[in-house]
């Protein structure tokens, strides 16, 4: 990992009516993605979890965003929640075909497992092998049951180059394993899931972690899912600011 990594920071989703005035300044919904793309470096698409999007929708999102902007998409819940990773290949191929419209702007596919899904190494291995059919992008998996937090799972993910999603929330534990040159973080709200803001001290701590991963040559994706009351966009902007400040301070020390 000789090169420095890249950071992509944003929110989980952007179509929140509660943000219309305070964050979007009253702009119409059709302008919200462009607005986010002018302020964040990446965004996580949450809508894909609930409903498969058309290839035309993905193509439109690609056109509406600048060249260096990146998307992470949350894979549809059919495979992760309904099928619990059983018979994964057909669902993976379907997801791959729909998301192709994003082209090179698709950076990561997130696979979120439900909280009641306990560790099943056989299914995980089958799923990980099936993901080789989608080598053109990176993949991360979010475990919400602690039975998955063990060395055998981490080794499987390392073998197949799948990242652990470090998922911070009040309602389930965080697993901070790092298994690839990608670190994927979801910040759901530490005190109250989906509804609490991150304090400045917490954001500074995440900024320090991100800076360390970047120095190690890892790409870092951080998406805020504490969308209530507009916490997510404010926290994302603050984390971007903190990372930029750390970069300036590091450059100044090198000059001195």
Task: Name each model-derived stretch.
Residues 1-256:
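Residues lining hydrophobic/aromatic ligand-binding pockets adjacent to catalytic sites
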